[in-house]
Swiss-Prot record:
It comes from the Bacteria. Binds 1 zinc ion per subunit. Catalyzes the sequential NAD-dependent oxidations of L-histidinol to L-histidinaldehyde and then to L-histidine. The keyword NAD applies. NAD(+) binds at Y130, Q188, N211. This is Histidinol dehydrogenase. Zn(2+) binds at Q259, H262, D360, H419. It comes from Escherichia coli O157:H7. The lineage of its organism: Bacteria, Pseudomonadati, Pseudomonadota, Gammaproteobacteria, Enterobacterales. Pfam families: Histidinol_dh. GO terms for molecular function: histidinol dehydrogenase activity; NAD binding; zinc ion binding.
Length: 434
């Protein structure tokens, strides 16, 4: 089915509708799983020596110093244009503003007289950021990860990226307060962050995107007792656009293509109650596709993508919630009015002037988002991901005395005698003091 095929949702059977919303299959092959497991074990056992061997094998690079020096970072900064530095500064300012606003006030309540309960937040002590390499370095992800880590107060923030690390990544790391940067990529970088080596410190939590090997490595270390937590499950990038007859076809097409160019496994979907809009968007996609350097990648992604005509906007919202897109763009006359009906989406973009690119780079929201349907249970990355909540309780003698019989009754019902005794002993002590 080509992207030019216009699908009438209400002419499809329930089975066909489910198939239309299926994502491209993702699963790590047995060979990837085994290879990653071997890499993790090797790095854990052999440390820096294993990292250097894997860099030579996979990155075809001889790494003398794993840690990037301050001089190298300063030189990278000198090579960047002032225009790019200024653009990064604007983006960081907006990201700071939005994520600082996410700070939660402490909870401090008396649930009953003499029983005080609190909830306080503490930063995750150490975090590791993974940034992929390649021809198009994702320095914007450095901004999205390192900025909230700094605001949260994480004591140790380190970054790994495959050598040679792009100047943009090094400058972004410095700009956002990353303390150490390491010339390590792939699954071996995840292993180094999870277990620690002579050069790379072990961290409590790992953030960042990557290829199938990196994704599998993150999954595996998150399940090992001696490993590390991870940010969220990862999958191919995706966008769903809801548009009515008031939308601009060229705008819609550009948003669909900006997602499709990420990779051949990306998925884009258009939902519209207007068949003419669907046809106009399809034509605009073809026109714009011809001008893209990554046209072949985008075209492959479009093979698993959909143009769907619905009964009305309410049905568009219903289908979108069923799919739960990573990015949801609403280009309708009443875009803001539809938000209350949206229950599952990573990030929502309202109106003609809110392209996904704004959130990807500089509006202030985070571009690290749940994909592959995980929006049903996962949130977009935010300050809370770099923090942990801790509860505190304090009972006075009056509060304890009032609650004691309740606790004893509940503990006895669960046949946890020691729990009951911990209360009874204190009750008896109070009686003796009286």
């Amino acid at each position: 089915m080509s992207f030019n095929t216009i699908i009438d949702w209400n002419s499809c059977t329930a089975k066909q509708q489910r198939q239309l919303l299926m994502r491209p299959a993702i699963s790590a092959s047995e060979s990837i799983t085994r290879t990653v497991n071997d890499i993790l074990d090797s790095v854990k056992a052999r440390g820096d020596d294993a990292l250097r061997e894997y860099s030579a094998k996979f990155d075809k690079t001889t790494v003398t110093a794993l840690k990037v020096s301050a001089e190298e970072i300063a030189a990278a900064s000198e090579r960047l244009s002032d225009e790019l530095k200024q653009a990064m500064a604007v983006a960081v300012k907006n990201i700071e503003t939005f994520h600082t606003a996410q700070k939660l006030p402490p909870v401090d309540v008396e649930t009953q007289p003499g029983v005080r309960c609190q909830q306080v937040t503490r930063p995750v002590a150490s975090v590791g950021l993974y940034i992929p390499g390649g021809s198009a370095p994702l320095f914007s992800t450095v901004l999205m990860l390192a900025t909230p880590a700094r605001i949260a107060g994480c004591k140790k923030v380190v970054l790994c990226s495959p050598p040679p690390i792009a100047d943009e990544i090094l400058y972004a790391a410095q700009l956002c307060g990353v303390q150490d940067v390491f010339n390590v990529g792939g699954a071996q970088a995840i292993a180094a962050l999870a277990f620690g080596t002579e050069s790379v410190p072990k961290v409590d939590k790992i953030f960042g995107p990557g290829n199938a090997f990196v994704t599998e490595a993150k999954r595996q270390v998150s399940q090992r007792l001696d490993g590390a937590a991870i940010d969220m499950p990862a999958g191919p990038s995706e966008v769903l656009v809801i548009a009515d007859s008031g939308a601009t076809p060229d705008f819609v097409a550009s948003d669909l293509l900006s997602q499709a160019e990420h990779g051949p496994d990306s998925q884009v979907i258009l939902l519209t109650p207007d068949a003419d809009m669907a046809h106009q968007v399809a034509e605009a996609v073809e026109r714009q596709l011809a001008e893209l350097p990554r046209a072949e990648t985008a075209r492959q992604a479009l093979n698993a993508s959909r143009l769907i005509v619905t009964k009305d906007l309410a049905q568009c919202v219903e289908i979108s919630n069923q799919y739960g897109p990573e990015h949801l763009i609403i280009q309708t006359r009443n875009a803001r009015e539809l938000v209350d009906g949206i229950t599952s989406a990573g990030s929502v973009f309202l109106g003609d002037w809110s392209p996904e690119s704004a959130g990807d780079y500089a509006s202030g929201t985070n571009h690290v988002l749940p994909t592959y349907g995980y929006t049903a249970t996962c949130s977009s990355l935010g300050l809370a991901d770099f923090q942990k909540r801790m509860t505190v309780q304090e009972l006075s003698k009056v509060g304890f005395s009032a609650l004691a019989s309740t606790i004893e009754t509940l503990a006895a019902a669960e046949r946890l005698t020691a729990h009951k005794n911990a209360v009874t002993l204190r009750v008896n002590a109070l009686k003796e003091q009286a």
